[in-house]
Amino acid sequence: MTDQQLDYQVTVEELSALMKRTAGVHVDPVTLRQQADDGFDTFGLDSLGLLGIVAELEKRYGLGLPEQAERCKTPADFLALVNGALKTGV
């Protein structure tokens, strides 16, 4: 693991942009932050859309994310899992 891996973090703003780019779902970052414990379905993002986000992040960071990332139900859970994986390099 390199020191750079420790600096990787997906923000709410990045997640909002990924939702728009990979799934065509527009959610304002402020709203996403305020409702981070609401289900992805509340924002119109389905499991296929989440899979696209996971694939984009794996490509961006060059590592496989935990399988559970594809099954996260809320943005808060997703960001916690993904950022934990990026921090440890798993």
Swiss-Prot record:
Q: Which domain of life is it from?
A: Bacteria
Q: What are the Carrier domain coordinates in residue numbering?
A: 9-90
The answer to whether keyword Phosphoprotein applies is: yes
Question: Which Gene3D superfamilies does the entry link to?
Answer: ACP-like
Keywords attached to this entry: Phosphopantetheine, Phosphoprotein
Record PTM O-(pantetheine 4'-phosphoryl)serine, positions in chain: 47
Matching entries from SUPFAM superfamilies are given as: ACP-like
Share the record's PTM remark.
4'-phosphopantetheine is transferred from CoA to a specific serine of the apo-ACP-like protein.
What exactly does this protein do? Involved in developmentally regulated synthesis of a compound biosynthetically related to polyketide antibiotics which is essential for spore color in Streptomyces coelicolor.
What name is this protein filed under? Probable acyl carrier protein
